[in-house]
Amino acid sequence: MSMQDTVADMLTRIRNAQMARKVSVAMPSSKLRKSIADLLVQEGYIASAEVTDEGNGKATLSIELKYFEGKPVIEVIKRYSRPGLRQYRGKDAIPSVQQGLGVAIVSTSKGIMSDRAARAAGIGGEIIAFVA
């Protein structure tokens, strides 16, 4: 059986690993997952993300999680747009997460970017998830 929502699976794996105080989490890789992980590294929510090839044609994305004083850096990680109800917003309607303290992950025509970068570039897109 194929996975229907790979982004929700990724976010759930990260959330569960942080609740269990794991150092890292591994999952099947895809271009979308890698782009989201790179954005989370850039924004400082995770320590690192790297793709390793297992030789059988399947790549694995390994994410090293971040903690501050024993608590996970990511307090909230939530899927917003989902396969059954896509959420698209124009450049002026991109939501701010926790009054700018969090980040909304936006899929635009220029690739995956944060809400701040999308507003600065003047483009809207699909609001994938919220992280704070």
UniProtKB/Swiss-Prot annotation:
InterPro entries, A to Z: Ribosomal_uS8, Ribosomal_uS8_CS, Ribosomal_uS8_sf
Keyword annotations: Ribonucleoprotein, Ribosomal protein, RNA-binding, rRNA-binding
PROSITE patterns: RIBOSOMAL_S8
SUPFAM superfamilies per record: Ribosomal protein S8
GO MF annotation list: rRNA binding; structural constituent of ribosome
Disulfide bonding pattern of the chain: none
Ribosomal protein listed as a keyword: yes
GO cellular component: ribonucleoprotein complex; ribosome
A Gene Ontology BP annotation from the UniProt entry: translation
Record note on quaternary structure: Part of the 30S ribosomal subunit. Contacts proteins S5 and S12.
Family, per entry: Belongs to the universal ribosomal protein uS8 family.
Role noted for this protein: One of the primary rRNA binding proteins, it binds directly to 16S rRNA central domain where it helps coordinate assembly of the platform of the 30S subunit.
Protein name stated in the entry: Small ribosomal subunit protein uS8
Species, as recorded: Psychrobacter sp. (strain PRwf-1)
